Every structure is written in C-alpha cells, then in structure tokens.
Amino acid sequence: MRSSKTAVLKVDPRRPDAAAIACGARVIREGGLVGFPTETVYGLAAHRSDRKAIDRLYAVKKRSRGKPLTVHISDMTMIRSAGCRMTGSGKILAKNFWPGPLTILLKSAGGRKIGFRMPANTVALRLIAASKVPVVAPSANLSGKRPPTSAAAVLKGLGGKIDLVLDGGRTAVGIESTVIDVSVSPAVILREGAIKARVLAKFIDIA
C-alpha cells in the first residue's frame, strides 16, 4: 500500500469490526504504516523486522534515528519473542498497570534496552494480535508536534504520507505513557506521563 492518499476506516472502539482490524494488520505485515488509537494518543504502527518500513517510519515522522521505538504488545509472550525477559519490578508493574499507559524498558540478551507497552484499547490490542509480527508504534505525528488524540489530527499531520488510519474516535487519556527503565535498580523514570511517579513508587523502588 503506497498511495498518495491515506485510507481511513472507522471502527467502534469497543467492538471493532474484524474486517477493519484484518485490513490494518495486513498493511502492517506488508510494510505499510497504520495510524491507530490507544488509550493515550494515536500511534503509528510498523513491522519492527521490516527495515524498509522502519526507515519509512523515521522519514515520515522526521524522527531522529537516535530515538528508539517502543514495541507494542498484546500479551506477555511477545516480550520473550523480542529477546527480553521481565525483571521482578517489571512484573509487579505489568501486573498492576498493564494494559495501560506505561512503557517498561527492559534489557535484551544483546544488552540493548527495548521499551514495551500493552495499551488499554481494544482496537490497539486486536490490531497488534492480528498482525502476527512485532509491532513498533511511536505517536502518529511529526516529531516535536503535539501527539494526536483523534484520527483527524493524525490526518492533519501525516495525511498522504501513511497508508491507513483506523478511526476509533478520540482517545480516552490524551497524555502520553509514562516511561520507566526497570533494567536498573532502583528503577528510573525517563518520562512522566499518564501515570505519576508517586503512584509507581507505591509498588517498586524508584531512583
């Protein structure tokens, strides 16, 4: 899918149409870029193992190559498939805050840190599961611009540059996820977002 026009499919955020989800998953598998709703902001999904798709994702967003991409998952087994293992503190956070607006950084077998997030949004979870490939998804906007909370906002910034947008209405939270590194002890918050540091500190030690 490489047209100059971005397709839009409306989906019920609670009961998304299976055909729309399948269409989005197919676009991702084929190397396309798909805007989709999460509970925080709209994400821009790409096949993590497709080099051309990742190159295009960085180019479309005008994103610095030094900024890593978060892996979005629909179940915990996807963490191990990505070459990582949950730490003890990570398990505690996942149990209490996933699905939800929390990105957890883990260290891979090769020593590289990878962020994981399980969004609390039915459209997102079904799209990730149906893709059957590892999915990365930064916010669906030009870098430095306000993250979009609606399909219209995605199209305003990236219309004609991406392949598909699944329009699931306005996002519920509207604030980006909190990012925490649990590969170190005590854990370190890299970005405070929808979940406040003081809330996380009730569950694990934070620097």
What feature does the model see in each segment?
Residues M1-A207:
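Active-site-adjacent structural elements in enzyme catalytic cores
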